[in-house]
Amino acid sequence: MECNDSRLFDTNNNLTLFVIEQLYRFRYLYSNVHPFLSFVLCVLGLAANAIHILVLTRPRMRQSSVHTVLVCIAISDMGTMTSYLMYISRFEFLSDKEGYSYFWALFLKCHAMLSIALHAITLYLVVLMAFIRLSAMKLTTSRWLDHTRALTSVILIALFVFIMCVPTLLAHQIDETTRGVTMHGIYYKYSVGFSTLMMKNGCFLMKANLWLTGIFLKAIPCLLLVCFTIALIHRLRENNEKRKILIKEERAKKRGDFTTYMLLLMVTVFLFTELPQGIMAILNALFTTQFHQMVYLNLADVLDLLSLINCYVAFLVYSFTSSRYRQTLFSVLPLTRVSYSGVSTRQGTLKCHANPSVKQLVQRVNSAEVTSVRSPLMEKKAAQATRSNTFQPADF
């Protein structure tokens, strides 16, 4: 790809050439591992997010609009991993140098757009989740706690992102690469490349699309994440100061603060993984020819890996930090199924239901404990009661 843009690297500098050479070497070495690593991450990620959706849709977990957004994030992540799993299977494990059928060429063209769109949707939904939590911390009766409002926001975000990704779909075209004849007839092979329209006038439309993608789908959500992270930290500090004054409300505020800390951890992880990608997207638009070929393509697999890792963030954070989530998770898994009741799992509301064997075992243990602590006087009274209750034939 040759575009009329400014130069970023001095190709006459030995240090620059050495760094670029190492990037190419890294790409060559990592490309041998990436397909297998990505395949495993996609398979495990699909299972993890399916379980995540199952847990968050339980009645005891549907009380929060944040959980509604988390379900939508999991669905988006599953779409990302499904598309990438199909891409890895066909274009890495079963690659064909001559080209592919028109169906697979069309899939590759759509995959280029879907991978960007679904990942951007996830990023904006994390921003929405942070906004909802911040609104709830300011006002406990915030309208953003309503599930319908949260779901409407998710739909609007998805529509906005897909509209922004239409130029990416148009930026690629399907080209015929091979034509041959077999005993079954004529066959055609196709590949996907950049559109000739996008490459005209010094890649004007291509650079415009890169700017559009870099700013609206990377830079802006990253900037919003930074703002909401700072706002959440500031709000937490204010709450801590209030708690020092109102000691009696500490227990009531503990759950809310705990939820905020979990969300803050998620936002921070997304920020550290997405901010470098946002910077690279801007540089890719500024220095398209050099940066795209020498840096972006050499690190493309690493960026894909970060995107796949982000698909695990919500499940891992909730699994390791939320006892309520873990208890609900154990209740829905077949091998660890235990029924729970009550609103709060922090106040000993664990119960066993509809399991006679468990009830009988508990009764036996309780009776054994009572028997073991009986005094001789208690045993004597029990024996007298048994004799008095012995069946006597009735007189007719």
Language-model-derived ranges and their functions:
Residues 27-39, 66-129, 136-143:
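Extracellular TM2-ECL1-early TM3 structural module of rhodopsin-like
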Residues 1-47, 92, 396:
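Extracellular N-terminal segment of 7TM GPCRs
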Residues 224-225, 266-273, 278-282, 299-355:
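Seventh transmembrane helix
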